[in-house]
Amino acid sequence: MKKIILAPAVVLLCAASAMAQDSEPKFTIKPTGRILMDGAVYLGGNDDIEGTSDKKFVDGVAIPDLRLGVKAGYGKWKAKVDVGFGYGKVGLKDTYIEYDINESNLIRGGYFVPQFGLNSETSSSMKPSYEEPTSNEFFYANPRLLALMHIYDKGQFFAGTTVFAEADAMKKNATEMGKQAWGVQTRLVWRPMHSDGDAFQIGCSFNYSSPTGGDHNAFNYSSNFPSRVSKVNLLTANIDHARGLFKMTPELLFMRGNMALEAQYYYMNVARKDGFRNYRAQGAYGMFRALLIGSRYRYSHADCGMATPDPRSLEVVLGYNYTNASDASAGIYGGITNDASCTFNYYINKYMIARLRYSYTNVRDRRIDDLTVKRHVNFIEARLQIIF
């Protein structure tokens, strides 16, 4: 009788043990990496720079971005560590821990790019226009920061809220810095349509930051011509006697079938003290995207933007950017730039993309040290990138 009773009991215990093991979260680990191989030819752009501190455009090739890293997951926990080796310089990239509270909420802490504007949904190597718009770079819209971020992502609404310390907090300790700048920002999006081949969303992002430059009483903003083979300064604004900064960027995304339109406007106001006038700057960009080969664009719900097109798709991207970094009332003339570009992207497979880009970029009203007041350049770039 005891054997008859014990036998089913043992079977039940074994089954319960097996079920417990099956429900136990599995630890996963995955290597990651990327390599970008660029080549560029510059047509003109070097006139009237003799005797100035302007750099020359030089035709050439480069590997501007090379990274190796690892992703790990365990149940609702995720982690990532990414190290960059671009131009032979070693630097820490994304390094964070993430916890999924539920299907609609997550918290991320560490060193990463927080949500701010439409461009925050793609990494630097996945910009459809080859490089990020100049306005996005100049307004320091998507830097990597030591931050804590909460994401709400459900149905028609997306909200990302972040508190952060300045980027130098990853390079220096607090005593060495003397003081740490801080800030808070949010990205708010409404997307009444958000399915593959049919999406429309509008949103706005807001940021407040304390000064990071000098002895934490200034802001230093700059951007290069949109090329990483030759790095040549385009805009520069050094704003001293700063008390704090407010910036915002409304965004628009429309996608229908194999065509899409995206745009952002940027506005920045730096409050100043000691009787100095506030500094104001603004900019905007727009991109028209179309699949020449491929069925339709897809929507990425988690990123709140467009997903990478399917393998063997060919895409054309027409882009225009305007940035005004000169403010006469503040006595700061960082420059005014226009950029028009045409980019072809061929998505070879899941891991490889080939890009070809033509761009015309000019700058005027630039009164920075002994740089030329105005300058322009035409250039053609090609890139092969591998990302896994």
Describe every region a protein language model picked out.
Residues 16-20:
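Sec/Tat signal peptide C-region and signal peptidase I cleavage site
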